Amino acid sequence: MSQYTIPHVIERTPAGERSFDIFSRLLNERIVFLGTEIDDGVANVVMAQLLHLQADSSDQEIGLYINSPGGSTTAMLAIYDTMQFLRPTIATYCMGQAASAAAVLLAAGTKGHRHVLAHSRTLLHQPSTQGNGTISDLALQAAEIMRVRSQTEAILSKHTGQTVERLRRDTDRDRIFTAEEAIEYGLADTLVAA
């Protein structure tokens, strides 16, 4: 998980003042913010927040706000599976960018509740890995990356309405979508204008 200074906010009530880090304050409003590369640590935090919000209220919407360059496919799939089995509506918002694994999470929000901000971008591409080891190890890694690619294409097909064949063609190289293009492609539903 990348490290940066986390701002605090002061909440004033008749009972006094309380200081919160900004992410705790957002969580109180049922907002989960994914603003870094997705790795196992980030996935664990996001999943814990989603599970907490469902336990808090299983009938209130959860907002997943995304500004991420993507990251680990296995970490993304852990978040994806968590999103799919939760009962609340999961509204997704692309702020800045939802690239690679993060684009899958954007598309995986509840249909009709997937939003992109006006100047955001979404990027799809095929999964990649860096191989090392013996030829036998490399063959196993290649088979695994092909399995993950097929799995990711099936997930995107389910949520976008695109065929697996089209997704395979479109993700052979980086495919960048403007906010409007992401909606046309089925990655999102609504443009949030400024």
UniProtKB/Swiss-Prot annotation:
Subcellular location: Cytoplasm
Keyword Hydrolase: yes
Top-level EC class as recorded in UniProt: hydrolase
Keywords for this protein: Cytoplasm, Hydrolase, Protease, Serine protease
Record-linked InterPro entries: ClpP (IPR001907), ClpP/crotonase-like_dom_sf (IPR029045), ClpP/TepA (IPR023562), ClpP_His_AS (IPR033135), ClpP_Ser_AS (IPR018215)
Known catalytic reactions: Hydrolysis of proteins to small peptides in the presence of ATP and magnesium. alpha-casein is the usual test substrate. In the absence of ATP, only oligopeptides shorter than five residues are hydrolyzed (such as succinyl-Leu-Tyr-|-NHMec, and Leu-Tyr-Leu-|-Tyr-Trp, in which cleavage of the -Tyr-|-Leu- and -Tyr-|-Trp bonds also occurs)
GO process annotations (BP): protein quality control for misfolded or incompletely synthesized proteins
Active site: residue positions: 100, 125
SUPFAM superfamilies from the UniProt entry: ClpP/crotonase
Keyword Acetylation part of the UniProt annotation: no
Entry's EC annotation: 3.4.21.92
One of the Pfam families matching this protein, by short name: CLP_protease
Role according to the record: Cleaves peptides in various proteins in a process that requires ATP hydrolysis. Has a chymotrypsin-like activity. Plays a major role in the degradation of misfolded proteins.
Subunit composition and interactions: Fourteen ClpP subunits assemble into 2 heptameric rings which stack back to back to give a disk-like structure with a central cavity, resembling the structure of eukaryotic proteasomes.
Similarity remark: Belongs to the peptidase S14 family.
Name of the molecule in the record: ATP-dependent Clp protease proteolytic subunit 4
Organism, scientific name: Rhodococcus jostii (strain RHA1)
Organism phylogeny: Bacteria, Bacillati, Actinomycetota, Actinomycetes, Mycobacteriales
